Structure formats: structure tokens, C-alpha cells
Amino acid sequence: MSRRNFKVLYVSGEVSPFVRISPLADFMASFPQAIEEEGFEARIMMPKYGTINDRKFRLHDVLRLSDIEVDLKEKVDLLNVKVTALPSSKIQTYFLYNEKYFKRNGLFTDIHNGSDLKGSTDKVVFFNVGVLETLQRLGWKPDIIHCHDWHAALIPLLLKTVYASHEFFRDIKTVFTIHNIYRQGILPMKAFQKLLPEEVSSALHCSNDEVNMLYTGVEHADLLTTTSKVYAEEIVHDGLQTYGLGRVLEEHQAKFYGILNGIDSRQWNSAADKLIKKRYSLEHMDGKLDNKKALLEEAGLPYTEGTPVVGVILNFDEFQGAELLQQSLEQLAALDIQLIISGSGDKKYEKVFQDFALEHPEQVSVHGEYSDSFFHLAIAGLDILLMPGMIESCGMIQMFAMNYGTIPVAYAGGGIVETIEERDEESGSGFIFHDYSAESLVGKLEEALACFHDEESWQQIVMTAMTRDFTWKKSAEEYDQLYRELLEP
């Protein structure tokens, strides 16, 4: 079978621009396109959340994919499917919908308040079983189902148990990618026992009457990946990074690979971006100042010539660095900067940041609601992107930023050290702090600010950043090889 005949289904809880909760959505927006360019046929399945605007994204019903029965042991629920093309591509994206499960804002985390939703078990089981039932009704058989994070972790086990005897699913391989090891999907075993046959529920990884979905995906997938080589090493060998999964990852190390993320340079191109105030390039950088002014206006902050604008774009939780950011606020406010904090999540952090902005109305702004337009404008308008997250499997935002001449200041770890060339006297594309503390973060930011005020040095670092190659080409070729090896008889 030639490579061009291979079919890959990507299953995820989020895909940008339809919904973005974490960097996984950015991955899903661009990686399937890169794989298609390698000669595969790619399709996507995700939940149809209540926040997804059918008209905006041109979703339409598929009559032959209506009223699909999803057997949840003690009940049968119906599934309907809508479809559209992933923007700027021909990749069919299927949205699985049932009002009872998906009408609320989020499937696993409420986008607006950040709290875990009650009853996530029935939602995740419905979604995972629904994916397989939809494939059967659709009659499109993938060679590989590539599952992302715990939201899709049940599919490899389902294929090896209740669906193993189905002719349609014979020989389908599974790949499971870990984007967020600290989000593992810990759910009550009793709920799974009510929804799944005994042969499935008994094979789930259970401890203290709780199921670990991420662990289950690791155990049963045919191939495991994560989003950088350094991160793969860290989560196998570094006890601080594994969050209880070190042993199972070490057991399956032979099938575990780290492949660095890339970005879609067509979507993230400052010279062609339709979502920013004014397009610009390395040869014509004047437009970046226009974007800076537009960003400040959007954020409700005054423009002051020569004052750097520093931005933080993150989920408000401890893993993404909200706690460290909170610890750093007073020191940041003492610097001659303007600070824009964009994100949502834990209400505790939201209140802290909003209160701090009220105390510093001319210097600090908090932007809560995610939108593609603000995200792109921020990447284009910021001078410096501050990344306080302790754990960064790879991240893509620092690559977006460097493409746009926005310089990252980030904590060392995972894909950060693979994507940011640390600044020294001669070269570099960003700044990295190695001690996870407020003092280290602020100290490294001060280094970046000193560079900013040295025009020649700043031009050099911006040029280095904007000429880095972050395209998916190399990573897609690595996945191409892994996929083909997995499918060899």
C-alpha cells in the first residue's frame, strides 16, 4: 500500500479556531494539514460544544450521520454529527453532538469558570464510543486513529476489547500523544462500571477507586508520542515532571517518541495576517508599532513612546504559571513596562489579576475572553512575551511570537530549550530563566528590557527570532516515518 493511501483520523477535545482551551488546539489546527502534505488523508473528530458558532464556521448537518446509537450499557443515547472544513484547508472536521452532553461551554473544563464539570465520565465515554460509532456509520476506515490527551484516551482500549471482533475496525492502529501530563482525567471507577462492559472497565487503570485516563491511554495505544524530545526525557526520568506516570512511561519507553511541534507559517505570517492591525515583515517593521498601539487601545492602556509592552497569555492554573505570575506582580509593577495578562481559568487567579489591574489602571490590563483576533493582535503588538509556566511540553506560542518579532522570556524545560535560542552576547532569539522563582523570572525579564533599550541589540535579537524556521516540515517527516513503521505488516 502506498503512503498516499494511508488515512489518519485525529481525535481531540479542542481544535482552533473552533475552541481553544490550551495549546493542543493550536497543534490540531495545523498538524493535520502538515500530514496531508506528506501524502496522507487526514480527518478530525471533536465534540460540538455549545460555544461553537455554526454559522460563523459554516457547520452543516450530515443526514446520514444523524441519530447514531451510542450504547452506554444501561442506556442508549443518540449522536448527531455536523461537518465543516478546517479553515484554510480541505480537511473534513466532524463535530459530535448531543445536547445533554455538549450544550454547556466545555466538555471537560468550563471555559468560563475553569472548574471541572460534574459528570465528566459520561461525557468522555459518550465521546470516545461515539467516535467509533460515527466511523462505522460514515464508512470511512482510517489506518490510524491518532488520539490526543486524556479526552480521547479510551479509544485504544475500546479497539482492543469490545470493538476487536468488528471487521470494520480490524487492523486499525492507534497513536496516543501526551500534550499535558498534569491533566490526566482522574474520574470515579463506579461511573465507568455503569457505562462500559466489564471487559473494558476491568482493563482501565484504577487506583483508590479512581480511573486515570491518561495512564489508560499510555497502556493500550500502539504508539506513544509527546511534543518534544527533551520533554519525553523529562517525563520518563524526572520525578517532578511525571505526576505518577513515570513507571508506566518507562515500561513503554520502546514505543515512546518525542517529536517537536511546528507551526503553520501560512497562518502565522506577519506579512499576510488578516487578523492584525497592519501587516509587516523583517524588511518593513513599521507595522509592528501600529499593532502595538492597537493592542494597547484594545487593552484600555495608554501608549507611551519607548515603554515596552509585556504580555502573558496562559490558562490561569498553577501548571501554566499563574501562581508564579501572582508572586511576581509587585516586582513587575515596579518596572517601567506595560503589562497585559490574557487568559481565563481558576477564579482565584482571575480575581487576583483583575484586582491588580484595578490598582494599576495605566499600567496593567487583564483580557479574559479568548478570540483569534485578540490572540493574533497580541502576538503582533507585544514587545515581549512572558511565559511563567513550569511545565511546557513544547508550546507553540513562543514560536508564533518569534515569527512576529515578539521576544519570549520563558522558563527552561521541555520544548522551550529546543525552540528558543538562549540570548548571549553574540546571538539568541529569546531569554530563558533556569530557577523557578519570581526573582529569577523578574531578573531575566530585566535582562530582556535592557536589551530592548539597546536598539542595535534588540534589532539583532528580533532578526534572529524572525528568521528561525518553525515550520512543520521536519516534524511531519518524522511522523510520516513513525506512521509507516507502525503500519508495516
UniProtKB/Swiss-Prot annotation:
Pfam families listed in its UniProt record: Glyco_transf_5, Glycos_transf_1
Binding annotation for ADP-alpha-D-glucose: 20
EC numbers: 2.4.1.21
Associated pathway: Glycan biosynthesis; glycogen biosynthesis
InterPro entries, per database record: Glyco_trans_1, GS/SS, Starch_synth_cat_dom
Keyword Transferase listed: yes
Domain of life: Bacteria
Record-linked NCBIfam families: glgA, PRK14098.1
Function: Synthesizes alpha-1,4-glucan chains using ADP-glucose.
Protein name stated in the entry: Glycogen synthase
